[in-house]
């Protein structure tokens, strides 16, 4: 369980990747909420603040991930990305799964969510204070490539 309860939910504007984003800090302290991404093509994407999603082209019949109601998307851990990071610290191997939805999480962490001001990019960030590492991933859409996910790992110590 996360032990950084003194951190409060807050909102602010931040610039990175040549774009301006609205940041919601400490989303782990909030119940999951639904977000959509704007698109200038036939791509649609609905995401939960916990990382689950549904997306596709044209309509629900062309869904890439199962098209479900928001309550089901919030609880499903099988719709969306999964990342497992192996870290060796002092000769000991540790596994970290950012945005793990399980109740038991052995690490102290902070989760932040960023949406750009155009509404067509969404960034998830988890900072692992125990292992001194952070993980970010961004969802965008592209008429040529479809749904695009990029990710980044940063050592914070």
Where do the model's predicted regions map?
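Anionic coordination/interaction segments
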Residues: 1-157
């Amino acid at each position: 369980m996360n032990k950084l309860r003194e951190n409060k939910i807050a909102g602010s504007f931040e610039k990175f990747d040549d774009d301006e984003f609205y940041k919601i800090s400490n989303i782990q302290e909030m119940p999951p909420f639904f977000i959509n991404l704007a698109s200038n093509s036939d791509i649609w994407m609905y995401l939960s603040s916990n990382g689950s999603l549904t997306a596709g082209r044209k309509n629900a019949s062309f869904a890439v991930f199962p098209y479900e109601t928001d309550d089901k998307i919030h609880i499903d851990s099988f719709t969306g990305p999964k990342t497992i990071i192996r870290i060796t610290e002092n000769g000991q191997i540790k596994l970290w799964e950012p945005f793990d939805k399980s109740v038991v999480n052995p690490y102290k962490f902070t989760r932040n969510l960023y949406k750009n001001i155009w509404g067509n990019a969404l960034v998830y960030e988890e900072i692992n204070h125990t292992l001194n590492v952070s993980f970010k991933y961004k969802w965008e859409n592209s008429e040529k490539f479809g749904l695009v996910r990029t990710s980044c790992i940063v050592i914070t110590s």
